[in-house]
């Protein structure tokens, strides 16, 4: 059970990173 929670945490972190990156890209393009 503990490993599932760990996997979900990693997946959430990965999702957050992708969200931050895409947002940064959108921001960069919008400010050009």
Swiss-Prot record:
Q: Which reaction does it catalyse?
A: RX + glutathione = an S-substituted glutathione + a halide anion + H(+)
The catalytic activity of this protein is classed by the Enzyme Commission as 2.5.1.18
Q: How does it assemble?
A: Homodimer.
Processing after translation: The N-terminus is blocked.
- Which residues does glutathione bind? 21-22
- What keywords tag this UniProt record? Cytoplasm, Transferase
- Gene Ontology CC, one term: cytoplasm
Tell me the organism: Dicentrarchus labrax
Stated family: Belongs to the GST superfamily. Alpha family.
The entry's function note states: Conjugation of reduced glutathione to a wide number of exogenous and endogenous hydrophobic electrophiles.
Superkingdom of the source species: Eukaryota
GO molecular function terms noted in the UniProt entry: glutathione transferase activity
Q: Where in the cell is it found?
A: Cytoplasm
What protein does this entry describe?
Glutathione S-transferase 8.2
